[in-house]
Amino acid sequence: MTVDALTQPHHLLSLAWNDTQQHGSWFAPLVTTSAGLLCLLLYLCSSGRRSDLPVFNPKTWWELTTMRAKRDFDANAPSWIESWFSQNDKPIRFIVDSGYCTILPSSMADEFRKMKELCMYKFLGTDFHSHLPGFDGFKEVTRDAHLITKVVMNQFQTQAPKYVKPLANEASGIITDIFGDSNEWHTVPVYNQCLDLVTRTVTFIMVGSKLAHNEEWLDIAKHHAVTMAIQARQLRLWPVILRPLVHWLEPQGAKLRAQVRRARQLLDPIIQERRAERDACRAKGIEPPRYVDSIQWFEDTAKGKWYDAAGAQLAMDFAGIYGTSDLLIGGLVDIVRHPHLLEPLRDEIRTVIGQGGWTPASLYKLKLLDSCLKESQRVKPVECATMRSYALQDVTFSNGTFIPKGELVAVAADRMSNPEVWPEPAKYDPYRYMRLREDPAKAFSAQLENTNGDHIGFGWHPRACPGRFFASKEIKMMLAYLLIRYDWKVVPDEPLQYYRHSFSVRIHPTTKLMMRRRDEDIRLPGSL
């Protein structure tokens, strides 16, 4: 669960663009005319200093709009950003779907992350239309109380000893249900299976067992993110003043609002039932029951103040499901493509979990698995530029780089592939971070859940993903089961493919692996 995860889960924005092309054609003439006139008017009426940085993908003098430049960025962003920062250690501007974006080299990340004038919440609220109905999750994320961030950073950490074992037990059954027990080699759509696994596992800890086994809720949890990304993308193509009207005319807008309505209908009775139970217990002078899920943690953190419970849960699903899935799939694929890792990893899992059981301490001790995942994240970061934020006022960096108020800013992930920082950066070295953990000065930052300027896969504190601690535990838990229970190998003559769109770099949704059931399972302390 990450602020950046909220912005581009998997191939969602590629789906958004494709849907715009297929269903938004009747808008095209009006988009071109109205956007062009509005941009010209805003340019003529604007005042104040403008950025003097070059634009990598400028529109030509005869183009009324930046539509072509936006399409080009969506198609080429990762290669463009890599190309620029492999030769330049200085900022560059791009035309992106929401306007102009200044992308900084990672050498400026330390100064960037400390600037309060650059706001991630402003980005989430603006680019994901938090003021419009249907985007209720983003409205709750960006409220001044920041309740979601507090729950993720505090409750998911302190409650870990209580939820790790129940979550592991739930994941065990889900994995058997999804991946089966066939002991014959067969090809599976591992991308889709892992997405289903994460959806069901995350939902269990978010809303408890009752809704976690409700097929209608699971469908909303999985698909609401796609609908929201599609609609957000389509609205960003329109002038700001027209978006509230367009939102009511677009089919995806209607679908989005219907999903939110149904989510409320499913969740609200559970919330009301728990509150009534709590009040009744307190009236009798007895301690009310406590549930190990985020419904309970939101209630505890809110302390009786109003919050949008459904919006909070939809936002948690949006971030937790798709961000976690990408690293789970990427980590599994990298391990399978390096089969010499399978037995060392199984030995580690047998020893650590076999002796300590499912506890936060045991998950911490899975050091090789942790190193494999952090290396997967380094080799293929989920985004080529991260920590996107809007400037709340004019900002000038110490090197003179000027960012005008209202402009989008991000940091390139170029340092994660810099040979001066990482020897043989293109090579997947699963032991890289395990070796670093042997150095006391580097042991902390070498862990998957911790961040520094050399590895911004989860961002960089204080702009780091607040849910990374939970995500790392969950992913290691699921991978432990998958590696112990099943044999894996790559599909012959099927190279690994990535899907690149806008800022995102994802494992391709068509990714497949071969698998079969092994006779072994995880043996916990005290089991036969």
From Swiss-Prot:
Biotechnology: Lovastatin acts as a hypolipidemic agent that works as inhibitor of (3S)-hydroxymethylglutaryl-coenzyme A (HMG-CoA) reductase (HMGR) which reduces HMG-CoA to mevalonate and is the key step in cholesterol biosynthesis. Lovastatin, simvastatin and related compounds are widely used to treat hypercholesteremia and reduce the risk of cardiovascular disease. Furthermore, statins such as lovastatin were found to be anticancer agents.
Record keywords, A-Z: Endoplasmic reticulum, Heme, Iron, Membrane, Metal-binding, Monooxygenase, Oxidoreductase, Signal-anchor, Transmembrane, Transmembrane helix
InterPro entries named among the record's database cross-references: Cyt_P450, Cyt_P450_E_grp-I, Cyt_P450_sf
Any Pfam family matching the protein: p450
Reactions accelerated catalytically: dihydromonacolin L carboxylate + reduced [NADPH--hemoprotein reductase] + O2 = monacolin L carboxylate + oxidized [NADPH--hemoprotein reductase] + 2 H2O + H(+); monacolin L carboxylate + reduced [NADPH--hemoprotein reductase] + O2 = monacolin J carboxylate + oxidized [NADPH--hemoprotein reductase] + H2O + H(+)
EC number of this enzyme: 1.14.14.124, 1.14.14.125
Superkingdom: Eukaryota
Cytoplasmic topological domain residue ranges: 1-23
Subcellular location: Membrane; Endoplasmic reticulum membrane
GO cellular component terms listed in the entry, alphabetical order: endoplasmic reticulum membrane
Residues binding heme: 465
Gene Ontology MF, one: heme binding
Xref: Gene3D superfamilies: Cytochrome P450
Example GO biological process: lovastatin biosynthetic process
Residue spans, topological domain Lumenal: 45-528
4Fe-4S recorded as keyword: no
Membrane topology note: Single-pass membrane protein; Single-pass type II membrane protein
Entries under SUPFAM superfamilies matching the protein: Cytochrome P450 (SSF48264)
Transmembrane residue ranges: 24-44
Cofactor: heme
Record note on disruption phenotype: Loss of lovastatin biosynthesis. Accelerates degradation of lovastatin precursors.
Enzyme class at the top of the EC tree: oxidoreductase
Pathway: Polyketide biosynthesis; lovastatin biosynthesis
Function of the molecule: Dihydromonacolin L monooxygenase; part of the gene cluster that mediates the biosynthesis of lovastatin (also known as mevinolin, mevacor or monacolin K), a hypolipidemic inhibitor of (3S)-hydroxymethylglutaryl-coenzyme A (HMG-CoA) reductase (HMGR). The first step in the biosynthesis of lovastatin is the production of dihydromonacolin L acid by the lovastatin nonaketide synthase lovB and the trans-acting enoyl reductase lovC via condensation of one acetyl-CoA unit and 8 malonyl-CoA units. Dihydromonacolin L acid is released from lovB by the thioesterase lovG.
Family: Belongs to the cytochrome P450 family.
Name of the protein in question: Dihydromonacolin L monooxygenase LovA
Organism: Aspergillus terreus
Top-level taxonomy: Eukaryota, Fungi, Dikarya, Ascomycota, Pezizomycotina
Gene expressing this chain: lovA
